[in-house]
Amino acid sequence: MSTLRLLISDSYDPWFNLAVEECIFRQMPATQRVLFLWRNADTVVIGRAQNPWKECNTRRMEEDNVRLARRSSGGGAVFHDLGNTCFTFMAGKPEYDKTISTSIVLNALNALGVSAEASGRNDLVVKTAEGDRKVSGSAYRETKDRGFHHGTLLLNADLSRLANYLNPDKKKLAAKGITSVRSRVTNLTELLPGITHEQVCEAITEAFFAHYGERVEAEIISPDKTPDLPNFAETFARQSSWEWNFGQAPAFSHLLDERFTWGGVELHFDVEKGHITRAQVFTDSLNPAPLEALAGRLQGCLYRADMLQQECEALLVDFPEQEKELRELSTWIAGAVR
């Protein structure tokens, strides 16, 4: 029986693909070597320890229907579209070795006619007239008996959109999460015009087979066909949940301030696990009572725009004469935390 397993995803759903990856990793035999090839439609993927409000322009993501997905490995934030090819190599220990998977990807690129080299701990770069440019970034995860190396190759990604979603609003966030390091990048189409996802997948697959000296049939997976993936429904539910993608952010503080016609407002939030643990409100409004009441209501509230808006509007019952002010406040807060 072959020790290799090759899976190719037909889905562009990042939550589906990351859930598949997690399930395979958890249940694979320690003797198995796995290659999983996939890609995501418009998504910002953040590292396990990152703060999405610090890393991403969450408001613009929501406006443009760009998903957020938190992966189980460390590292920084990246933007995925269908111009990226994603790969995951898995193996049991002691065989797991990220230098092997890196060499497989380099051999695949070489077979396609691209001379690339490893740079630092996580990147593959090519030489261009403008200097070295990154074409691949990676992240890793290890447990006591297995490990995986996953990464992306930039084929024909819309690089202008990287800045749209990975440059956050100038929020006053004093956060403890890991900050992404920005790198100069280029697409493989600059070197190989017309290169496709299918060609890259085939090259990586052939390099994978060549390294291990055996071949297997590919398993094509999709939301309608998830072979041999125990507990997939539960894993997908977690991967797609707000609690995982947003709520797992490291503790941080957020300061918001705005001046309205009726007075200035300053809000201080401490947030842990996606919940407000402390809310302070400062104002020079002539009627501070509704704002003081809001501070109490926000304690324990989910740090989500719709939930904050709901708490603001709930105050209309007790302070109907301040309806105009409360609606202005509600709209502002909801926009500020998206």
From Swiss-Prot:
* Residues that, per the record, bind (R)-lipoate: K134
Instruction: Output one GO MF annotation.
Output: ATP binding
User: In what residue span(s) does the BPL/LPL catalytic domain sit?
Assistant: 29-216
Any transmembrane segments, and where? none
- Specify which residues bind ATP according to the UniProt entry for this protein: R71, G76, A77, V78, F79, K134
Q: Where in the cell is it found?
A: Cytoplasm
- Known pathway: Protein modification; protein lipoylation via exogenous pathway; protein N(6)-(lipoyl)lysine from lipoate: step 1/2; Protein modification; protein lipoylation via exogenous pathway; protein N(6)-(lipoyl)lysine from lipoate: step 2/2
Q: Tell me the keywords, alphabetical order.
A: ATP-binding, Cytoplasm, Ligase, Nucleotide-binding
Q: Which Gene3D superfamilies did the record assign?
A: Bira Bifunctional Protein, Domain 2 (3.30.930.10), CO dehydrogenase flavoprotein, C-terminal domain (3.30.390.50)
Gene Ontology CC annotations of this record: cytosol
Under the heading NCBIfam families, the entry gives: lipoyltrans
Q: What does this protein do?
A: Catalyzes both the ATP-dependent activation of exogenously supplied lipoate to lipoyl-AMP and the transfer of the activated lipoyl onto the lipoyl domains of lipoate-dependent enzymes.
The family classification in the record reads:
Belongs to the LplA family.
- The protein here is known as Lipoate-protein ligase A
Native organism is Escherichia coli (strain SMS-3-5 / SECEC)
Give the lineage. Bacteria, Pseudomonadati, Pseudomonadota, Gammaproteobacteria, Enterobacterales
- Corresponding gene? lplA
